[in-house]
Amino acid sequence: MREVAFLLASLLSVPAFALSQAAKEFMKITAELEPVQCEKRKLRRAIALAEIERRNEDVRSLRQRFAALDRDPKTARMERRLAELEPRLEKSSDPEDLSAINRQRVEAFYRCE
């Protein structure tokens, strides 16, 4: 009975190991960038609202905050690495890569809300 339980547990955990190294790295970096991406998403919405409502002073300050996030060297380095990995992942032969990354993005989107 223990052997069957062990076999089932190991079979269920196989998809996590099925991801390519590039996908694992992409997902790791994306998870590290999640708070910054969430803040950028909120700032984009606030900027759009301020522009519609013609609150020019707010637009200026929000854009400055957004630019400050982009100037962070650590963030810029991680975003550059994601840009390098993305073409490799689009051509990946592993069918699990893109679905796992998409699942992570959807979960991050709803956590940010």
Regions found by a protein language model. Give the residues of each.
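Immediate post-signal-peptide N-terminus of mature secreted/exported proteins
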Residues: 18-57, 110-112
